[in-house]
Amino acid sequence: MCVFSATDFDAHEDVLFCHDPSVGLLGIIAIHSTKLGPAAGGCRMYPYPSVDAALTDVLRLSKGMSYKNAMAGLPLGGGKCVIIADPSSPNRDELLRAFSKHVQSLGGKYWTAIDVGVGPKEADVLAENCEYVFARASQYPEGFSVSNFTALGGFMGIRAVSKHLWDKTDL
């Protein structure tokens, strides 16, 4: 698949293909927009059936992050990255370390975080070689679950709908 003619390319600013044969790394970083600030979006580790499937996913997800960050009023653009691997792989940490060097090479143009297959502990591994990582386990108290943020976001969305429909936010 030619990246520029891919249906989901949609004028992405950057698409970086990451490869490190010493650990078997295949990954993609997609930066959709930096108009509002550095691109931000999670790092997904998933055993995609093909590079084309991974490319389609990362392009769609990074564009979605542009809209998500803008709608949340954040000074962030949209980006996303994928590592084509099974998160239960015995060399998972080596893959994360190798991949993080590619994120670091962007110098803050893209910030990554947790996503499918990459949790806060894995974010700590990414942060060993990269300063542009959100949601690291080391940033939270012992036992804290980042799913609390997901739940809060869902609740705030319900409140916003309630305010719009019924002019009430007390649920």
Segments (PLM) and residue ranges:
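N-terminal ligand-binding/catalytic initiation module
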Residues: M1-F144
